[in-house]
């Protein structure tokens, strides 16, 4: 079968369902896909079973089960991620395996917010999911409208507690299962025939309006992690790597950041696949020729960046998932003072883990394999780090944890 071309006509947004186990995240994912397919024949229907049996993926040495569904509204194209198990959510959000521009928090109206509801909201805040909309599910099981109001109030309070705008976040109340069943009975149902189906249309209109279109990588400030360095006789030093974001032109001034003192230089040439380029953009694997830079001035682990856009740091706070023994992680706990390697972009840097903090703010004495914990890290030399950056924790070449920087300390 010939592959269909991806038409880039609408803005693209990455979105995901989050919330407590059995509150209906996967059912809602299936319902959105079915409801949009009932109106627009270009949306491919994904059944509940297909979404629920999520394939394994590997991100930063960790196996994660995630399901990807794509669909579109009149305004946008969406890639939607759903995870079958709670541990998969934690790993997915921390490794950034599936980056989310926004999330739909699913809360069962019959049960109200539960422990994982809280944990997913906290995680969304820590890893920088910018906006959340709420779907109160299983509304067909609640007869008392006052109870629905009470649940909504509880969820709003919880969102505010974790610094989301709880008072203004949009809520939609419905039943994912009944919407899905209506679509199964009549796959071309469209809008205006069933109140539960219409609730899903309402939800997607809100997602369209409320979750902002993300800034494209190309429009951000230039950054490239250096993977390799070599010198060309008579021409100078070339740094190679993949441009993470932004764009770079020949003749521009850039900074070399990390490991040593920041150095300013000019791009005198760009190459890709042995051909010269005038400009490299996000996603390109390029060689960058640098003026007046010796091969000894630059090494793997440094980054090339737009001047002033990123600075080197040694101390930061991070949210970390520690791998279990079964996932190839440690067999034993570790304690404050533990010194593993932190794999940042392209290189390992040794660092000391100074302390651990649990979700409730208390200090933890030790960390077990399988835990998720907030930690304070001190690296032995400065690296270009920023909030929201992902890294792996390694010990003797094997990955023992994955983390995301939540706060720069120094």
From Swiss-Prot:
Entry keywords, A to Z: Chloroplast, Elongation factor, GTP-binding, Hydrolase, Magnesium, Metal-binding, Nucleotide-binding, Plastid, Protein biosynthesis
Reaction catalysed by this enzyme: GTP + H2O = GDP + phosphate + H(+)
Region (G4): 137-140
Sequence segments annotated as region (G3): 82-85
Known EC number: 3.6.5.3
Record localization: Plastid, Chloroplast
GO MF annotations in UniProt: GTP binding; GTPase activity; mRNA binding; translation elongation factor activity
Keyword Repeat: no
Signal peptide as annotated in the record: none
Protein name as catalogued: Elongation factor Tu, chloroplastic
Organism of provenance: Cyanidioschyzon merolae (strain NIES-3377 / 10D)
Gene name as annotated: tufA
